[in-house]
Amino acid sequence: MSWLTQRPQTSDPTNYYTVGLNKTTLLVGLGNPGKEYAGTRHNVGFLCLDEFVAKTDAMGDWMQKKDLKCLLSSGQIGDSRVIAIKPMTFMNLSGEAVQAVISFYKIDPTRLAVIHDELDIDFGQIRLRVGGSSAGHNGIKSVTIAIGEGYGRIRIGVGPKKPVRIKAEDFVLQKFSEAEQQQLSNLTREVNAILSEYLYGAQFPHDTRNFLV
């Protein structure tokens, strides 16, 4: 269900964000650009943010922002101006796009939520927290180097239930299994609910969610 019934009429997201606006929230989905990475575990951040933008009438269409190294959508939800971005830098340079957007739109780095895969968490779980280690995730490492660690993280488990004989970097670059694909609509629905809580609430949630049915 959508929150608002009409998309913004302007085609330029900068019209929404000028100096002095006191509550702008940045949503970041991590992934790698390119069709060959679509549908892979490592791109689950892109997947979830795409679904959020598609299902939220208040958010505008994706626009390419070459100067900010990302695809960007914007809108207003409740009393929060929202910018959603997908870095187009490849995963290990994601912080460049995040830093560019934060600087250009003068966003408080603590009003940021990053959606990303996490191999150390089993598929079916989403863990929410502010800060923490990168757990070897190069995208998170890049963002933290760029802006510090005081941002919210939506950590989507992609870990296998049983050990697999494959390197971690190869496993996350594989597409979701057929059984996992059947659960992705539940995943994106839960992430949308988490983002709604964050945008309408005062603080970033800190708990664990399960989306398997």
Question: Which residues are covered by each model-predicted region?
Answer:
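Nucleotide and nucleotide-moiety/phosphate-recognizing core
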Residues: 2-131, 141, 145-152, 162-167, ...
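Conserved TIR/SEFIR loop-to-helix hotspot centered on a Trp-containing motif
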Residues: 134
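Conserved glycosyltransferase catalytic-site signature
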Residues: 137
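Short loop/turn motifs enriched for small/polar and acidic residues
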Residues: 157-161
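Active-site-adjacent mobile loop/cap segments within catalytic or ligand-binding domains
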Residues: 170-184
